[in-house]
Amino acid sequence: MTQPIAKRFPTPPIDKLPDDIRSRLLGVQEKSGFVPNVFLTLAYRPDEFRAFFAYHDALMERDSGLTKAEREMIVVATSSANQCHYCVIAHGAILRIRAKNPQISDQIAVNYRKADITPRQRAMLDFAMKVSAEAHKISEQDFTDIAGHGFSDDDVWDIAAISAFFALSNRMANVTGMRPNDEFYMMGRLPK
């Protein structure tokens, strides 16, 4: 039985989307072999789609003091805490690929404190989780602690921004009933 991409809102046909959005979806499909459901679901509101992915790309694709794998660690840990099925599965796949580690995303999703990560990465995730769950409790001590692990002010901004951005993404995925593409489940688990 084929399940809907998202349970609660219609998914527009690709051929009916604005040219720029259709082009982006087809580019993603060409690169990965499928269109991730987040693209199709958010295309329901084209202006918001554009804003969402512009901010996503600014956070997740630029050069910074965080590796692309570390950014995905933040997404997986905070999405797990927010019980976002879509983001844990989709970004877990991306993390496995970027870290070249088939076990890391499962470890982080279940309990990042027991994952095979460095003390620096654990400090990063501790800060990210606090931003995600208790941002109102962030104190100067938190900034001192994370700086002690070699994170710059720009790195700390990135950790906070990724945590905050994916809180939005997690909530929209849950509200829309977005389901992960089947392709994500096996990505990065077996050597090519």
Mark where each language-model region is.
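Hydrophobic alpha-helical segments
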Residues: 1-192
